């Protein structure tokens, strides 16, 4: 479902006639509400049957996607704002489900097989998503060529909805070994207390502000790459898809390289390298509109974002105090980032709305031929400032004693407009000790 919905959100908003200011809302508001929903989900966990809650949310999410497809067919006057509202609900349901699904899978999949299972699942998901992404681009290009792009979008979202309904039905058939979590009083209060305690950690505070700040500055320009490609360069939908895949595929194939590099030299060095590369990405779009050049830029961005995403995820696990609640640190960092993304996207929308008038007033329009270029330049400058602020404050985490050899299992949750591939931690699992014990018994 992700490949036929999330990846086309910006393109769909442009098709519906979203203004530059509204593009900021399309990116920022769903991210903000999604994060709030994930925090709410922690509290809801003790009040509902886990399987039923997940199935109901999945079915409602499918209904939301079906509604998105209906917008393309009927095109009401306020279609863009209706789409933004549906996107908010879509992200909300995803994030309500996520913590429950993560806990459920953690109980079903044997601990010794989690790494192999989720590695295989990630490969299968990526192949399926990219295949459907290509097919979706082909459908949109074909229908757009006969002036019926609305039909292409309606088909895509209808297919995505049917896939989600099927997913909900399959989830309903699954066994849940712990259908209802025990009710614990004061869960919300305890969560807030854990957040306050985590925020007192200086290293974690600097890290969180860095990641959130970088995503904020990226969000300034993130919604407008699709606008530039589809509206200004007049890419076909298939060309648009291919340029996006160039980044996503590069991220996927370079994750292993960055993983080995960080094992050798540390996550801090990878963060420093990639945080110096990321500011240059919007600036590169100013130099040429050649399609092959843009594919090269996208591939380069995939390399940078792959290392940044992986190293920041690993760094968070490394810097948390020993025996502390990793879920609290991850939830707080995600919530902060979502809030900053909302601010950045709103700021980007305002800048884009007034960029043309500003360029004419200053006379810079002779140099910057497209108002969106001003958004790209401001995003580059602000990303650089965030990197310059964090690098002298970053520390290499000291190795802490561990009673067991542990590994943090990540899965690729999907793709987003901010950083492409989105990683999600699943669990902390014993790496080899269990296997060694079995051999000792033999």
Predicted segments, located by residue:
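Helix-loop boundary and gating motifs at the non-cytosolic
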Residues: 1-36, 41, 61, 66-67, ...
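Helix-loop junctions on the cytosolic side of multi-pass membrane transporters
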Residues: 153, 163-185, 263, 389-403
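Intracellular juxtamembrane helix-capping segments at the cytosolic ends
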Residues: 94-109, 307-322
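Helix-to-loop junctions at the C-terminal end of transmembrane segments
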Residues: 37-52, 140, 253-266, 352
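Structural signature of the two symmetry-related core transmembrane helices
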Residues: 52-68, 161, 269-284, 380
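Transmembrane alpha-helix termini and helix-breaking/packing motifs in multi-pass membrane transporters
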Residues: 11-15, 42-47, 69-74, 129-151, ...
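Helix-loop junctions at membrane interfaces in 12-TM secondary transporters
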Residues: 70-87, 284-298
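Juxtamembrane intracellular "pre-TM" segments in multi-pass secondary transporters
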Residues: 175-209, 397-442
């Amino acid at each position: 479902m992700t490949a036929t919905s999330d990846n086309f959100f910006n393109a769909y908003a442009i098709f519906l006639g979203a203004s530059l200011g509204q593009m900021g809302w399309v990116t920022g508001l769903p991210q903000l509400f999604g994060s709030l929903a994930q925090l709410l989900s922690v509290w809801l966990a003790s009040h509902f049957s886990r399987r039923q809650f997940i199935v109901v949310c999945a079915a409602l999410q499918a209904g939301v996607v079906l509604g998105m497809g209906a917008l393309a067919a009927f095109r009401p006057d306020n279609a863009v704002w209706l789409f933004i509202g549906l996107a908010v609900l879509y992200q909300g349901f995803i994030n309500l489900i996520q913590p429950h699904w993560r806990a459920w899978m953690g109980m079903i999949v044997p601990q010794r097989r989690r790494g192999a299972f989720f590695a295989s699942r990630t490969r299968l998901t990526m192949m399926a998503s990219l295949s459907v992404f290509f097919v979706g681009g082909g459908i949109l290009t074909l229908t757009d060529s006969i002036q019926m792009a609305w039909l292409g979008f309606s088909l895509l979202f209808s297919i995505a909805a049917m896939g989600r309904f099927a997913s909900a039905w399959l989830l309903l058939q699954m066994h849940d070994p712990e259908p209802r979590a025990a009710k614990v009083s004061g869960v919300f209060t305890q969560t807030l207390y854990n957040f306050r305690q985590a925020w007192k950690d200086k290293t974690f505070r600097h890290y969180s502000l860095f990641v959130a700040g970088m995503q904020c500055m990226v969000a300034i320009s993130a919604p407008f790459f699709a606008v530039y490609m589809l509206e200004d360069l007049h890419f076909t939908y298939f060309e648009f898809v291919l340029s996006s895949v160039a980044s996503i595929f590069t991220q996927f194939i370079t994750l292993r390289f960055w993983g080995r590099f960080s094992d050798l030299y540390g996550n801090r060095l990878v963060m420093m390298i990639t945080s110096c590369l990321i500011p240059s990405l919007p600036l590169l779009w100013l130099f040429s509109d050649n399609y092959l050049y843009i594919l090269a830029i996208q591939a380069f961005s995939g390399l940078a974002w792959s290392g940044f995403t992986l190293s920041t995820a690993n760094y968070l696990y490394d810097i948390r105090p020993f025996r502390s609640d990793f879920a609290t640190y991850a939830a707080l960092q995600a919530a902060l980032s979502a809030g900053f993304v909302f601010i950045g996207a709103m700021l980007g929308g305002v800048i884009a709305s007034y960029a043309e008038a500003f360029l004419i007033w200053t006379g810079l329009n002779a140099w910057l031929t497209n108002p969106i270029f001003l958004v790209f330049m401001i995003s580059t400058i602000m990303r650089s400032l965030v990197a310059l602020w964090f690098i002298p404050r970053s520390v290499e985490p000291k190795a802490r004693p561990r009673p067991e050899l542990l590994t943090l299992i990540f899965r690729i949750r999907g793709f987003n407009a901010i950083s492409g591939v989105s990683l999600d931690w699943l669990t902390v699992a014993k790496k080899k000790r269990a296997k060694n014990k079995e051999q000792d018994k033999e």
